[in-house]
């Protein structure tokens, strides 16, 4: 009995993955959605690990992501450590740039919350690109 349930599970995941990899949208709800996202994210990490730099070299290079404008934090004047806020009340980085989160909310690069994407995948369907954005 457990074997048949496991086989059914694997078949549904493989079917969902093959559908997601196509350009068409596929409807995924509940556990199918979660399993598919985990599979997609794990497989992308596996590919990066196999194609990329060995783990030992990655540890030596350290954090490759750096903020564009480093700034010193002042212990004497903590108000200087706060982010700048413009007239609209939105946080801005030094140089008038919007934080990265706000940049991604533009129409061209819209990012939904995980719950919104899960709801969308269940009702309308979603693509591989949508799901891989969660990784």
UniProtKB/Swiss-Prot annotation:
Cystine bridges: 29-122, 41-135, 121-126
Tissue-specificity statement: Highly expressed in rectum with lower levels in uterus and ascending and descending colon.
Modification type Pyrrolidone carboxylic acid: residues: 115
SMART domains from the UniProt entry: IlGF
Source species, domain of life: Eukaryota
Coiled coil: none
GO molecular function: G protein-coupled receptor binding; hormone activity
Matches recorded under SUPFAM superfamilies: Insulin-like
A Pfam family that the UniProt record links to this protein: Insulin
GO biological process, one term: positive regulation of feeding behavior
Subunit structure: Heterodimer of a B chain and an A chain linked by two disulfide bonds.
Function: May have a role in gut contractility or in thymic development and regulation. Activates RXFP4 with high potency and appears to be the endogenous ligand for this receptor.
Family: Belongs to the insulin family.
Protein's name in the database: Insulin-like peptide INSL5
């Amino acid at each position: 009995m457990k074997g048949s349930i496991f086989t059914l599970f694997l078949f549904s995941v493989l079917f969902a993955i093959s559908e997601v990899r196509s350009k068409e949208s596929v409807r995924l709800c509940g556990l199918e959605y979660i399993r598919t996202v985990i599979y997609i994210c794990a497989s992308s990490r596996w590919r990066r690990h196999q194609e990329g730099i060995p783990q030992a070299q990655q540890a030596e290079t350290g954090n490759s992501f750096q903020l564009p404008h480093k700034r010193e934090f002042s212990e004497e004047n903590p108000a200087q450590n706060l982010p700048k806020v413009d007239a609209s009340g939105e946080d801005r980085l030094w140089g008038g740039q919007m934080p990265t989160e706000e940049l991604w909310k533009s129409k061209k690069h819209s990012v939904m919350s995980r719950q919104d994407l899960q709801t969308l995948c269940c009702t309308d369907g979603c693509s591989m690109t949508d799901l891989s954005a969660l990784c």
